[in-house]
Amino acid sequence: MSLMEKILNVTRMSLIYKISLTFLFVIASNLFSINEENYRFKYKESEFKVNITNLNDKWNITYEISHPFFKLSQDTQFSYTNLIQVSEVKRKLIVMGGLRKIEESYKIDHVTKKIEYIKGQLTETLQYDGAIYDDLTAHLYLRLLNIQTDEEITLNVLERGKIRQKKFIKTISSPDTIKIKEKKEKDKFELFFKDNSKEILKVIQNVNGREFIWESH
């Protein structure tokens, strides 16, 4: 190999190294850092609690909706480095003090790209490709995502034993507030948060024609 070829080879490797570092930096900087959070929302006779906690580098989101007629809770475990990687989701609905109970869970294997879904006596295996979220981590991801507003974002979200493609859009609600809105024909989901701190301010949901306006207290 001539001296000129050696110089060109070193230059080429240096360029590849710089491009690789730039690519890694872009990935790493695409999401803001995550912090532990604790929220309590109220709407009329209902209460909505959300907690994000960390233990030994394992993250956990829990939420609980309490209503005179039902209680809905969910526990999601995930890891977070430069991306959110969900490992397990547990969801429970108790109606009329226990007259009816529904429990479901998802266990995600990121090596085989398979999800074990269990609901009562039913067990199914789902296959996925790319990033996967539940509703809680999807909303967290959208809050942390460092992108321009008014861009449509499509995420694979676990819902009712299926993997659904959900479309969201981030818009500016006020000078210091960002709104996340899910694009769908029925129902409605909107989440408002502070641009700098990422703190949730309000959540608006319309389910089966009934609107819930959850505001932080």
Give each language-model segment a name:
Residues 97-150:
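Surface-exposed, polar helix/loop patches in the mature regions of secreted/periplasmic/lumenal proteins
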Residues 34-108, 150-217:
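Acidic, serine/threonine-rich low-complexity disordered tracts
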Residues 6-20:
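Bacterial N-terminal signal peptides that target proteins for export
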Residues 13-15, 32-35:
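Absolute protein N-terminus
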Residues 21-32:
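Hydrophobic h-region of N-terminal signal peptides that target proteins for export
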Residues 2, 33, 131-132:
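Exposed, low-complexity/repetitive linear segments and helix-based recognition motifs
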